[in-house]
């Protein structure tokens, strides 16, 4: 940027069309967050009505994560082939229909299937909305684009918590899911009133359709084998997370089978850059493992261990959700200032100072607990707002929606595992201790993976001929693309 451009406030670098594109995507993501977290709010009510165990109840949260990898792949490929806008609208319709089905569910299996549909829609919304906004904004503002957008999910969670406190005591838990059908009206408006993403239009202007991940996996020479592996992965995940298996060894074997299938898909679709894709899935896996025990089971912790009533639960969840929303925006500013990876590491390190006090303070002082949760979620959860930008930078435009959607949502299986891990540990410890210890320990893994830029580093170790040295979104260099000390030595040579 020129000196003159740098002196202009950041928001003046955006025109009306770019703001409209962002606003539409942000509202879509808000509705996504609203629909998705409803199950966490009414988990105890559903558990009581259906007579579920704690692990079975937690698996209803996990169900949406089980289908996300496939939704991210399919709807991401739709976004790469036909445009980000169509994929975004389709995603909203999917998760809205799934939410309505939850309201009519007569039992556990039906609700589990409805949650699978929600997961597919959520995955598509994440990948399509994120690429849509990031590709519509100027390069030097794309961390802000990512962070501001993802804040919509947390705002949706806050709105859902407030609606829960008003609706459920009067009309029961099913009424909450009936409200979730409203996003379809918004989807119809989106289809007519928002432009296509600029990067996608420039890349595809006058050119033949791109070969998407769906084309490679399900229309290529290995399509039969890939269809069989897809069914095998879906079946394995069903048995792992539907509460049907009690043998940890069998679950571990099925988990390894799924991992092998997903790695195979990544190798086929990304070629020599598969080490980067696999490591991105690992990064996201641990990002969900550290954050989602709290996201999924915090309402249960507040209602059972702290004995809060629905109104107090809603107030505490407001602090938590609002903190995450503010953190997404703060993360956007930090990312554009410090760089994406450095901002991520600094924010997570600061959040570690708060995670133990959150679960050690107890429930005597609601306001202190709410304040601690606000800052912990702002620093620990909010920084994930720039995760789409971090992942998207490793993929070219014509593969970005599917690449982001697939890697992110395969890694998001950590979100399926997280509440079940928390519930299992809580059978031996109290739930607060289980949530705090999981989050505290696994956050350090994410700090190392992102701080050391392991996707680029492992790519350099295994397939250096396909190494990308600079971020495809903002053009900044990847620190893991060069050995330790090389950049410093180059700087010394330049000065001399």
Swiss-Prot record:
<dbReference type="GO" id="GO:0046943">
    <property type="term" value="F:carboxylic acid transmembrane transporter activity"/>
</dbReference>
<feature type="transmembrane region" description="Helical">
    <location>
        <begin position="247"/>
        <end position="267"/>
    </location>
</feature>
<feature type="transmembrane region" description="Helical">
    <location>
        <begin position="170"/>
        <end position="190"/>
    </location>
</feature>
<feature type="transmembrane region" description="Helical">
    <location>
        <begin position="224"/>
        <end position="244"/>
    </location>
</feature>
<feature type="transmembrane region" description="Helical">
    <location>
        <begin position="116"/>
        <end position="136"/>
    </location>
</feature>
<dbReference type="InterPro" id="IPR004742">
    <property type="entry name" value="SA_transporter"/>
</dbReference>
<feature type="transmembrane region" description="Helical">
    <location>
        <begin position="353"/>
        <end position="375"/>
    </location>
</feature>
<comment type="similarity">
    <text>Belongs to the major facilitator superfamily. Sialate:H(+) symporter (SHS) (TC 2.A.1.12) family.</text>
</comment>
<keyword id="KW-1133">Transmembrane helix</keyword>
<keyword id="KW-0813">Transport</keyword>
<dbReference type="Pfam" id="PF07690">
    <property type="entry name" value="MFS_1"/>
</dbReference>
<feature type="transmembrane region" description="Helical">
    <location>
        <begin position="148"/>
        <end position="168"/>
    </location>
</feature>
<feature type="transmembrane region" description="Helical">
    <location>
        <begin position="22"/>
        <end position="42"/>
    </location>
</feature>
<keyword id="KW-0997">Cell inner membrane</keyword>
<dbReference type="GO" id="GO:0015538">
    <property type="term" value="F:sialic acid:proton symporter activity"/>
</dbReference>
<feature type="transmembrane region" description="Helical">
    <location>
        <begin position="58"/>
        <end position="78"/>
    </location>
</feature>
<feature type="transmembrane region" description="Helical">
    <location>
        <begin position="278"/>
        <end position="298"/>
    </location>
</feature>
<protein>
    <recommendedName>
        <fullName>Sialic acid transporter NanT</fullName>
    </recommendedName>
</protein>
<keyword id="KW-0472">Membrane</keyword>
<feature type="transmembrane region" description="Helical">
    <location>
        <begin position="313"/>
        <end position="333"/>
    </location>
</feature>
<dbReference type="InterPro" id="IPR011701">
    <property type="entry name" value="MFS"/>
</dbReference>
<keyword id="KW-1003">Cell membrane</keyword>
<keyword id="KW-0812">Transmembrane</keyword>
<dbReference type="GO" id="GO:0005886">
    <property type="term" value="C:plasma membrane"/>
</dbReference>
<feature type="transmembrane region" description="Helical">
    <location>
        <begin position="406"/>
        <end position="426"/>
    </location>
</feature>
<feature type="transmembrane region" description="Helical">
    <location>
        <begin position="431"/>
        <end position="451"/>
    </location>
</feature>
<feature type="transmembrane region" description="Helical">
    <location>
        <begin position="92"/>
        <end position="112"/>
    </location>
</feature>
<comment type="function">
    <text>Catalyzes the proton-dependent transport of sialic acid.</text>
</comment>
<keyword id="KW-0762">Sugar transport</keyword>
<dbReference type="InterPro" id="IPR020846">
    <property type="entry name" value="MFS_dom"/>
</dbReference>
<dbReference type="InterPro" id="IPR036259">
    <property type="entry name" value="MFS_trans_sf"/>
</dbReference>
């Amino acid at each position: 940027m020129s000196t003159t451009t740098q002196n202009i406030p950041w928001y003046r670098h955006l025109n009306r069309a770019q703001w409209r594109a962002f606003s539409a995507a942000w509202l879509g993501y808000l509705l996504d967050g609203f629909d998705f977290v409803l199950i966490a709010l009414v988990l105890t009510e559903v558990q009581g009505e259906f007579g579920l165990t704690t692990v079975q109840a937690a698996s209803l949260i996990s169900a949406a994560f089980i289908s996300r990898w496939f939704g991210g792949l399919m709807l991401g490929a739709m976004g790469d082939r036909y445009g980000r806008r169509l994929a975004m609208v389709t995603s909203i319709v999917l998760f809205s229909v799934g939410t309505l089905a939850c309201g009519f569910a007569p039992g556990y299996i039906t609700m589990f299937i409805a949650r699978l549909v929600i997961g597919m829609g959520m995955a598509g919304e994440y990948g399509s909305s994120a690429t849509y906004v990031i590709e519509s904004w100027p390069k030097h503002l794309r961390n802000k684009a990512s962070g501001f957008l993802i804040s919509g999910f947390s705002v949706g969670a806050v709105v859902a918590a407030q609606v829960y406190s008003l609706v459920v005591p009067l009309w029961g838990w099913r009424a909450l899911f009936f409200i979730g059908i409203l996003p379809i009206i918004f989807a119809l408006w989106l289809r007519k009133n928002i432009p296509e993403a600029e990067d996608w239009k420039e890349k595809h202007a006058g050119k033949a359709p791109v070969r998407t991940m769906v084309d490679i996996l399900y229309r290529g020479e290995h399509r039969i084998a890939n269809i069989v592996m897809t069914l095998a992965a879906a079946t394995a995940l069903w048995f792992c997370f539907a509460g049907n298996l009690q043998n940890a060894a069998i679950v571990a074997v099925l988990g390894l089978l799924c991992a092998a299938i997903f790695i195979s898909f990544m190798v086929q679709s990304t070629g020599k850059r598969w080490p980067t894709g696999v490591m991105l899935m690992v990064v996201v896996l641990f990002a969900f493992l550290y954050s989602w025990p709290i996201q999924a089971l915090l309402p249960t912790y507040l209602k059972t261990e702290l004995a809060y009533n629905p109104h107090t639960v809603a107030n505490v969840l407001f602090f938590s959700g609002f903190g995450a929303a503010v953190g997404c925006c703060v993360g956007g500013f930090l990312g554009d200032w410090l760089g994406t990876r450095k901002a991520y590491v600094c924010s997570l390190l600061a959040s570690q100072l708060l995670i133990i006090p959150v679960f050690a303070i107890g429930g005597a002082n609601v306001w202190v607990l709410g304040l601690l949760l606000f800052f912990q979620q702002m620093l620990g959860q909010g920084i994930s707002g720039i995760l789409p930008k971090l992942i998207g930078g490793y993929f070219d435009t014509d593969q970005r929606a599917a690449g982001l959607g697939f890697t992110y949502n395969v890694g998001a299986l950590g979100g399926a595992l997280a509440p079940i891990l928390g519930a299992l540990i809580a059978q031996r410890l109290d739930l607060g201790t289980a949530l705090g210890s999981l989050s505290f320990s696994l956050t350090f893994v994410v700090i190392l993976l992102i701080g050391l830029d392991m996707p680029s580093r492992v790519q350099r170790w295994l397939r250096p001929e396909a190494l990308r040295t600079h971020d495809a979104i903002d053009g900044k260099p990847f620190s893991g693309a060069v050995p330790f000390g090389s950049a410093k030595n180059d700087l010394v040579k330049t000065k001399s």
